[in-house]
Amino acid sequence: MAINLYKTSTPSTRNGTVDSQVKSNPRNNLIYGQHHCGKGRNARGIITAGHRGGGHKRLYRKIDFRRNEKDIYGRIVTIEYDPNRNAYICLIHYRDGEKRYILHPRGAIIGDTIVSGTEVPIKMGNALPLTDMPLGTAIHNIEITLGKGGQLARAAGAVAKLIAKEGKSATLKLPSGEVRLISKNCSATVGQVGNVGVNQKNLGRAGSKRWLGKRPVVRGVVMNPVDHPHGGGEGRAPIGRKKPTTPWGYPALGKRSRKRNKYSDNLILRRRSK
């Protein structure tokens, strides 16, 4: 990630970092507008996810998570910024004239060739079924349901590892630390998702955060009792409860929120680490 350094004339330029290597110039046939609904509200207009709202208008880029251009080689033409995710995307020109966006694999550069299918080379950016991959392969964009497209390990810097194959299932270690079973016929992309250092990027000022649609985070202990169970009291008061809670009174900070008796419980060999 190439970082621009500016003359430190203001606090925002002194502390902020800007990636100068990747630009955004999407193709018209691979984008479409979308109704802005990322305000953290449900259908009744009630806040269900805090600290969201505002932000710049976005055009959605159609990403090829299925990689169903089988046995047709494609060339990386551009590496672009995508406002809808923290990973970069790259435009692929296939030999049959098809043009698609895929997630940018770490280390891939303009001019590299990729291909998807069975028995293709184990090369960064290639997509193939898990049954054709050797053990220890680093992968991303992993399918859970055959033919549905990649759903796991799609964020910037995400990488999973193929650690075992037995019967009809393959055992994967996911970025969260979870170890689970997936059908060997499901496909995945070789390599790690690019833009690894995104979590080390310093936005420099509050306005840059608001451009991304993220609002300020306020602690419940400094609110009034009407706004949060932790609020109220004289001066710096404790929360007044045995355990911390959410604004709606449910247990927070450690309470397991996963649905009980979920169908995939039998597929998870080791629960994800906190």
UniProtKB/Swiss-Prot annotation:
GO biological process: translation
Keyword Cell cycle: no
Subcellular locations according to the entry: Plastid, Chloroplast
Region described as Disordered: spans on this chain: 1-22, 224-274
UniProt xrefs under PROSITE patterns: RIBOSOMAL_L2
A Pfam short name: Ribosomal_L2_C
InterPro entries membership: NA-bd_OB-fold, Rib_uL2_dom2, Ribosomal_uL2, Ribosomal_uL2_bac/org-type, Ribosomal_uL2_C, Ribosomal_uL2_CS, Ribosomal_uL2_dom3, Ribosomal_uL2_RNA-bd_dom
Cellular component terms (Gene Ontology): chloroplast; large ribosomal subunit
Family that this chain belongs to: Belongs to the universal ribosomal protein uL2 family.
Subunit architecture: Part of the 50S ribosomal subunit.
One Gene Ontology MF term: structural constituent of ribosome
UniProt main location, coarse: plastid
Name recorded for this polypeptide: Large ribosomal subunit protein uL2cz/uL2cy
Annotated keywords: Chloroplast, Plastid, Ribonucleoprotein, Ribosomal protein
SUPFAM superfamilies: Nucleic acid-binding proteins, Translation proteins SH3-like domain
